[in-house]
């Protein structure tokens, strides 16, 4: 990873770019962010003349692509409009800092396998029809609440989302492709 990032940064620098913005997955769940920081340090050790001419911004996504993806797309759109890199980074970091994800598994099978839910709790939850509503924010995944039955999931997520929304700011509501549970 570090080597491939070096090649990209070398190429961008040699082509005259003045900045690169790199957004990575949650630094507490992956070493990608720390590797990117090390790659930036290595780039400047190889190219000391680049300091002050070529800025490498590494942004910790603090979550997963479903959360920071919007900021990345918006940042790319801003870049095509010649918005300064520092302003793009400020926008992206603000979005990431304020972004909260709510989701719920329709089966506890995978949550049990991953260790997020103990086996006994998963068994009882399946028998009783309990579904955890999970919250991802600031590097952490926690169980926000539980609902009984699949049909209660979406209304509860919408309720929680409305409570988290900051007025007059963009938001995204995303659902999977199983239309039988969407409706």
Regions found by a protein language model. Name each.
Residues 1-8:
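Short, small-residue-biased leader/transition segments that mark boundaries at the very start
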Residues 9-15:
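Short, well-structured alpha-helical segments in soluble
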Residues 23-27:
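Active-site microenvironments of hydrolase-like enzyme catalytic domains
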